[in-house]
Amino acid sequence: MQRESAIVVVVDTLDRVLLLLRPQWIGWGAGQWAFPGGKLEAGETREQAAIRETEEETQLKVRDLKEVKIPVDNKLTMFYTRDYTGVVKIDWEHDDFVWVTRDEIENYDLAPQVLEAYDWVLQNG
């Protein structure tokens, strides 16, 4: 059975989003750019998991999460925030990170729904 997951679209003051590069060995989404996030642990809410995973993967502390309202798998919840502190330092689960604008993002091999989520945040967030 698939576990529930949560991800966070982190947006900076220039409307750039944070993308993380998934390594080739990781399996699903290998070599693609994606938002920070991951699976829920026992007893966690989706928001708690999103906050924890973002900090584990990037060292950023995120707050004031709001839900991205696009159709996604019912096991996935997408959040966004413009409220974060810290400096990005990626963990072992990723090979690189980048802050990208809407014009730049289409030059990247993106995980599913990344572009759709970014557009939704720019229009609604």
Indicate residue ranges for each PLM-predicted region.
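Active-site-adjacent beta-strand/loop module that shapes the phosphate/pyrophosphate-binding cleft
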Residues: R3, D12, V62, K69-N107, ...
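Conserved Nudix-box catalytic region and its N-terminal flanking loop in Nudix hydrolases
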Residues: R16-R52, E56
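Short secondary-structure junctions
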Residues: E57-R63
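Charged phosphate-binding loop/patch that engages nucleotide di/tri-phosphates or the phosphate backbone
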Residues: L115-G125
